[in-house]
A protein has these predicted regions:
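Aromatic- and Gly/Pro-rich donor/ligand-binding loops
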Residues: 2-131
Length: 131
């Protein structure tokens, strides 16, 4: 079983960093993957505590506007997730665990990526939790 940590916005967000470090301590030896949109920022943290880093594709400004318009038109909040999450979802199996971390990052804007990830997990029988 591997554990995937989602929702990290980079180690310069000290709350996210604290959640990642504490989670790795709790999880111990298990293979733990940090899914991030800031791989450069998180490189040292991953090396420091033994995490494998996976980066998901952040949207360009144009894509953000496009997907926002599509979400408004269709009412489907996970529009665009398939694009951003593919690199990560290709690796996850029903034997794994997905933990949605991020602390206060859920307060800044609607967490569409996290909502999409949670829906993906539910549809594929992958256990997930808001951590």
């Amino acid at each position: 079983m591997a554990v995937f940590l989602f929702g990290n916005t980079g180690t310069f967000n000290r709350g996210c960093e604290a959640i990642v470090r504490a989670s790795k301590k709790l999880l111990g030896y298990r293979a733990t993957h940090l899914c991030t949109s800031n791989p450069e920022e998180d490189k040292m943290l991953c090396r420091d505590i033994g995490l494998q880093m996976l980066s998901f594709v952040p949207f360009s400004r144009l894509q953000n506007y496009k997907f926002a318009a599509l979400r408004k038109i269709t009412g489907e909040f996970t529009t665009g997730f398939e694009t951003a999450g593919k690199q990560v979802t290709d690796l996850i199996t029903s034997d794994d665990l997905c933990l949605m971390i991020g602390g206060d990052t859920y307060c800044y804007r609607p967490p569409y990526y996290h909502m999409g990830m949670n829906r993906y997990c539910e549809q594929h029988g992958i256990p997930s939790a808001l951590w």
